[in-house]
């Protein structure tokens, strides 16, 4: 039972701890926004190209015109919703990523169950493995979605009149389901590990270890961003008097305590700008 719980925990947190996963959430949303920015137009363009090909006599795709047109319009709508809403509300991007995945799976299910040829069935198998790799999400949610989609495929497959005699879709989709879950876990674990490492590096770079204030590097970068964007702001310099005397008289530990106390006072006083307090020198704050 302990092994099962450990396995579930690994799938739930992609090999991270619960605390590390919580820290990764904002970055995960950024990665999904960045991914949807190119995935949706790429899918739309691919479907439009397939629709154009289906209009060519003798292409073998003439009967699929309506299918390609429908899903091209669907991707265009999702792309438009992304541009209008989700780019401004990245905290909800997970909704769009799953809508996109369901759309891709619906396309694959139709190909596998209604067109009834090996090539079309292969499309679904490829989607089952590849689609979860396009987003960043916890492996357990992707695995559950993959299993549900496989169940839907098999249900539709038999409803439309196929039988167990044609086992290409059944056997291959089940194999790809397992492969997709395993590959999804490995890839998502790597993605989350990279995100965690990026956060650690960024925190060490942008945070003063002694006080917890933002660092001089962060100050220079943030000031440059504000200048480039034409943002006006006031800058208050605070210099801690008596630091050298405290170091010489009571030792560096006392001096460090003085610096930390100064930061605490600034942090408590500037409640609305506590994220904009920087330590730019030994005894200098901004």
Stretch-by-stretch model annotation:
Residues 196-214, 246:
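Amphipathic HAMP/coiled-coil signal-transducing linker helices
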Residues 215-234, 241-271, 278-282, 286:
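Conserved long alpha-helical elements within nucleotide-processing catalytic cores of c-di-GMP signaling
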Residues 1-23:
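Non-catalytic regulatory/interaction regions at protein termini and inter-domain linkers
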Residues 175-204:
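Juxtamembrane or sensor-core-proximal signal-transducing alpha helices
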Residues 142-154:
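Central hydrophobic cores of alpha-helical transmembrane segments
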């Amino acid at each position: 039972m302990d092994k099962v719980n450990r396995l579930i925990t690994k799938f739930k947190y992609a090999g991270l701890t619960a605390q590390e996963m919580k820290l990764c959430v904002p970055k995960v949303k950024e990665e999904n926004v960045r991914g949807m920015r190119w995935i949706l137009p790429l899918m739309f363009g691919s479907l439009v190209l397939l629709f154009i090909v289906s209009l060519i006599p003798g292409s073998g795709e003439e009967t699929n015109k309506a299918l390609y047109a429908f899903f091209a319009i669907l991707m265009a709508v999702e792309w438009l919703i992304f541009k209008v809403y989700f780019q401004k509300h990245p905290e909800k991007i997970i909704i769009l990523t799953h809508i996109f995945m369901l759309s891709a799976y619906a396309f694959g299910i139709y190909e596998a169950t209604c067109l009834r040829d090996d090539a079309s069935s292969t499309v679904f198998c490829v989607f089952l493995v590849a689609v979860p790799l396009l987003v960043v999400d916890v492996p357990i949610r992707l695995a559950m979605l993959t299993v549900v989609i496989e169940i839907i495929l098999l249900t539709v497959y038999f409803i439309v009149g196929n039988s167990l005699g044609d086992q290409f879709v059944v056997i291959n989709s089940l194999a790809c389901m397992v492969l997709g879950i395993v590959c999804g876990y490995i890839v998502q674990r790597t993605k989350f590990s990279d995100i965690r490492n990026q956060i650690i590096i960024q925190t060490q770079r942008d945070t003063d270890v002694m006080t917890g204030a933002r660092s001089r590097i962060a100050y220079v970068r943030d000031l440059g961003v504000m200048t480039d964007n034409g943002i006006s702001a006031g800058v208050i310099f605070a210099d801690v008097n008596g630091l050298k005397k405290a170091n010489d008289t009571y030792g560096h530990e006392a001096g460090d305590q003085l610096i930390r106390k100064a930061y605490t006072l600034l942090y408590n006083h500037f409640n609305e700008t506590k994220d904009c307090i920087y330590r730019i020198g030994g005894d200098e704050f901004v």
